[in-house]
């Protein structure tokens, strides 16, 4: 999870398994006022997902003031007939006495089915969230094997790990102007060779990502490689390339290559 808002670009399924429960968490791109074709596609993707789920979780940051973006989404919830649970995350960053006023503030704006304060980082109250969700979900056979934790491919996870490191290490200009594509993966018995392309829309962003004497991209590669090796369980050789594609977020060809071709009208 990135600390920077609105950086999710794809629907990501995370599967929670216990002996008698399977819950599929579907993380969608954040709904926002779109300024380009990519933004419109991400919004459409998020809205399409609503039809396929049983419960909506509205995740917000309890440590920041309720803002225009929150109110924009709450206004959209008026047309939703499914249960909507508000999750106030990052309660570890505020005082206990601030939690109830925060709950009351949101309660005045929408009749949430539940409001649950948690700290995902500290795992505070997350067990309660699971118990509440179990009460809202229908009985069903498991969709996934009990050992499965995500439906995402290795190629997608690798590109997201690289993009995550870019977001962690660069300034606020970069997040919405970068995407990563895993171009090639070659497996051997003892190692994996990976080539990943980092795409930005301006030349100065390429310079930021490469850094002085290539120091930034080396650090991005080092951190990403460590996580990829943990993911895949093998030695990884990671090659990172940076390419400038002006206005790529308005170019249907590139957006289609990212897997969004089903969301164009």
PLM regions: where:
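Conserved nucleotide-binding/hydrolysis micro-motifs of P-loop NTPases
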Residues: 5-7, 29-32, 62-66, 91-94, ...
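P-loop NTP-binding site
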Residues: 154-265
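Solvent-exposed alpha-helical segments within well-ordered globular domains of core cellular machineries
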Residues: 10, 14, 44-51, 68-75, ...
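Conserved C-terminal guanine-recognition region of P-loop GTPase G domains, centered on the G4
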Residues: 16-22, 26, 41-115, 169, ...
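Conserved, well-folded catalytic cores of nucleic-acid-processing
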Residues: 15-19, 34, 49, 53-56, ...
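Short beta-strand-centered segment that lines the nucleotide-binding/catalytic pocket of NTP-utilizing
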Residues: 1-14, 26-28, 233
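Flexible beta-alpha connector loops of hexameric P-loop NTPases
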Residues: 1-2, 31-39
């Amino acid at each position: 999870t990135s600390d920077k808002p609105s950086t999710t670009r794809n629907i990501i399924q995370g599967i929670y398994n216990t002996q008698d429960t399977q819950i599929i968490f579907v993380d969608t791109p954040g709904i926002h006022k779109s300024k380009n074709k990519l933004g419109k596609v991400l919004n459409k993707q998020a809205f399409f997902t609503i039809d396929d789920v049983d419960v909506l979780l509205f995740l917000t940051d309890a440590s920041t003031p309720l803002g225009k973006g929150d109110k924009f989404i709450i206004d959209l919830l008026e047309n939703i007939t499914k249960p909507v649970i508000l999750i106030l995350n990052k309660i570890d960053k505020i005082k206990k006495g601030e939690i109830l006023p925060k709950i009351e503030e949101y309660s005045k704006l929408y009749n949430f089915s539940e409001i649950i304060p948690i700290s995902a980082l500290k795992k505070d109250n997350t067990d309660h969230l699971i118990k509440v969700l179990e009460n809202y979900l229908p009985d069903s056979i498991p969709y996934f094997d009990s050992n499965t934790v995500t439906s995402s491919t290795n190629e997608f996870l690798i590109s997201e790990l690289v993009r995550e490191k870019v977001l962690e290490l660069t300034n606020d200009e970069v997040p919405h102007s970068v995407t990563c594509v895993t171009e090639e993966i070659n497996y051997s018995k003892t190692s994996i060779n990976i080539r990943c392309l980092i795409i930005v829309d301006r030349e100065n962003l390429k310079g930021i990502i490469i850094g002085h004497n290539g120091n930034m991209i080396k650090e991005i590669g080092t951190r990403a490689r460590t996580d990829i090796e943990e993911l895949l369980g093998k030695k990884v050789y990671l090659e990172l390339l940076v390419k400038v594609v002006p206005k790529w977020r308005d170019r249907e060809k590139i957006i289609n290559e990212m897997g969004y071709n089903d969301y164009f009208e």
